[in-house]
Amino acid sequence: MPNCFKFHTVIERHWQKPYPVLSFLLKPLSGLFAKIAAKRRTDFLSGKRQSEKLPVPVVVVGNIHAGGTGKTPIVAALVSGLQEKGVKVGIISRGYGRKSKAVHVLNAESRAEDAGDEPLLLFRKTGAPTAVGSSRAEAGRALLAAHPDIGLIVADDGLQHYALRRDVEIAVFPAADTGRTDLDLLPNGSLREPLSRLDSVDTVVVSGGKADALFRPSENMFHSRIEVGRIYRLNNPSEILDTGRLKNQTVVAVAGIAKPARFFDSLRNMGITVKRTVALPDHADISAADLPDADAVIITEKDAVKFSDGICTDNVWVLPVCAIIEPDLAAFVLERLEDVPKAV
């Protein structure tokens, strides 16, 4: 795991600031990847490969990057917005990081190893019926069988999962990449599909800041920003942390997410002095035994769902976040669904 993690870290740094030697080696592979990805999508669009239409509208929230775009909080915000408008929403996802490959409809007893950390977090934050499966269509069928009153399904990720037809496509794109001219497809870059793919989605949500003035891939553009909530105790969420009392304490921050630096910066921006940071691979397993010794250990919500109730973690605290999307993305989705659905 350490060697794999180190190699992945090198590649991610290359994606952010390309190394000429690596680009020379990886560029041909990116060209091959582009041809394979384009053919796969064309096969689904032409009907050469079969795709399935669920009996309710499907809204896909995904990205053309290989993770780290801030998509999960945006999915939670969209689902909550639709719920506020009286829509019975369900969520489907692949469930990255879980140990089982079987379709699983989440319930109060579901654990991260059953569902994956992100779907479990979405389920707990929104209360929306949720199912996971490597086949999004199969997960959708299972979800509708368990909750037949669902009127709309939001697919967390899956923009490239063309085996499931969708009625609305939402692409999340990081603001930091909107002005870049050196983006490339995997493995030389972090893109799963070319930038031109953004021309065919219903809307683009720019996450984490303002977009470059020249970035306008869609006539329908939304922007999201992250707001942090009050830090709470892991084993007693009603107890809020008084950050003022941390001044003379040892504080360690731990994150198993795609862009851990964002989490660490958020804590520092709150005036918290973090003595040590621990960055784990995205979706990494984590338990109380893995946490460093400190007066206070602060973790992400995504990591918090991996801990079982009743474990002695009195010194572990959780920083909640939420996405603020402007303008109203939920209203846009409902307006879009009044039009003729787009079969993909």
Curated annotation (Swiss-Prot):
InterPro entries recorded: LpxK, P-loop_NTPase
Pathway note: Glycolipid biosynthesis; lipid IV(A) biosynthesis; lipid IV(A) from (3R)-3-hydroxytetradecanoyl-[acyl-carrier-protein] and UDP-N-acetyl-alpha-D-glucosamine: step 6/6
GO molecular function: ATP binding; tetraacyldisaccharide 4'-kinase activity
Binding residue positions for ATP: 65-72
Top-level enzyme category: transferase
GO cellular component terms given for this protein: plasma membrane
Cited Pfam families: LpxK (PF02606)
Enzyme Commission identifier(s): 2.7.1.130
Catalytic activity: a lipid A disaccharide + ATP = a lipid IVA + ADP + H(+)
Family, similarity comment: Belongs to the LpxK family.
Function: Transfers the gamma-phosphate of ATP to the 4'-position of a tetraacyldisaccharide 1-phosphate intermediate (termed DS-1-P) to form tetraacyldisaccharide 1,4'-bis-phosphate (lipid IVA).
The protein's name: Tetraacyldisaccharide 4'-kinase
Gene: lpxK
